[in-house]
């Protein structure tokens, strides 16, 4: 499919008709939750949570795949039957059990050193950027920084320098830079795992940021292997043009996602 080739009605009708074969993979921030200045204050849009359990019963699998820690996702969404893949698929909460890739455990001292270096850096201290310590990774947020456009380049350079010094991978996003262990994994790996483990023959991915592009790429690859796939982008003022261009369907903000999920659950 190419960008904008399907309507909400067509997509929902097709997915519901083959629900037991479909894996539904959803991002959190900017998709299920409105983007807010304080990442810790992010909450799912009202009406989202009540839909997740009915969707999990109807579809082959429902998974939340995010850069957030998996326990955070499970705590704030709390729907049973849903898989919560955090840290880009390297951590999971499923049926109340937490699993973590052992390579993340081994890298915890390195992440701690990077967190300390960021906290002590001139760019972070003077800008007022907020550090989100995820234990297995660390993120620098500038969304609530005064004159954040002025500080974007200094914070970017600092994050890249410290990532290189600690041999960590840098993942940029919308006003956020995440430093994490260079363990090969992205949202696309999470999508492929959910599809393989659920036996799904079709998959829909919904996301709003650069980190969702690998998930879109996974859908494209699965289609070449004989699966059906749908790539859904969530539009906002900050949505990456590449993501919108790669989408089969574009929804307007978490409100659009809510309406789409309501159609899938109806």
Regions inferred by a protein language model and the residue ranges of each:
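Non-catalytic pre-domain segments flanking phosphatase-related domains
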Residues: 1-28, 32-36, 40, 47, ...
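The start of beta-strands in P-loop NTPase/AAA+ ATPase cores
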Residues: 22-24, 81-82, 203
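Conserved Rossmann-like nucleotide-cofactor binding loop
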Residues: 31, 70, 211
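Glycine-rich phosphate-binding "P-loop"
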Residues: 32-42, 174-183
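Short, structured coil segments at secondary-structure junctions
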Residues: 77-80, 166, 227, 245-247
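Conserved acidic, metal-coordinating active-site core of Asp-based
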Residues: 125-218, 227
């Amino acid at each position: 499919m190419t960008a904008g080739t399907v309507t909400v009605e067509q997509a929902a009708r097709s997915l519901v008709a083959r629900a037991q074969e479909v894996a539904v993979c959803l991002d959190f921030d900017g998709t299920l939750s409105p983007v807010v200045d304080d990442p810790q204050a992010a909450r799912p849009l009202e009406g989202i949570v009540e839909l997740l359990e009915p969707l999990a019963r109807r579809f082959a699998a429902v998974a939340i795949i995010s850069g957030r820690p998996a326990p955070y996702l499970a705590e704030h969404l709390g729907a049973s039957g849903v898989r919560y893949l955090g840290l880009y698929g390297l951590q999971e909460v499923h049926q109340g059990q937490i699993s973590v890739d052992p390579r993340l455990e081994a890298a915890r001292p390195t992440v701690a050193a990077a967190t300390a270096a960021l906290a002590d850096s001139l760019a972070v201290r003077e800008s007022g950027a907020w550090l989100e310590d995820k234990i297995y990774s660390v993120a620098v947020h500038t969304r609530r920084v005064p004159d954040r456009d002025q500080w974007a380049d200094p914070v970017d350079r600092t994050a890249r320098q410290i990532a290189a010094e600690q041999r960590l991978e840098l993942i940029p996003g919308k006003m956020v830079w995440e430093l994490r262990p260079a363990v090969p994994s992205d949202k696309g790996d999470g999508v492929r795992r959910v599809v393989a483990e659920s036996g799904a023959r079709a998959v829909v991915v919904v996301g709003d940021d650069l980190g969702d592009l690998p998930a879109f790429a996974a859908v494209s690859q699965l289609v070449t292997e004989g699966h059906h796939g749908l790539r859904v982008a969530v539009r906002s003022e900050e949505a990456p043009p590449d993501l919108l261009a790669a989408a089969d369907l574009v929804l307007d903000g978490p409100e659009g996602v809510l309406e789409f999920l309501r159609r899938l659950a109806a």
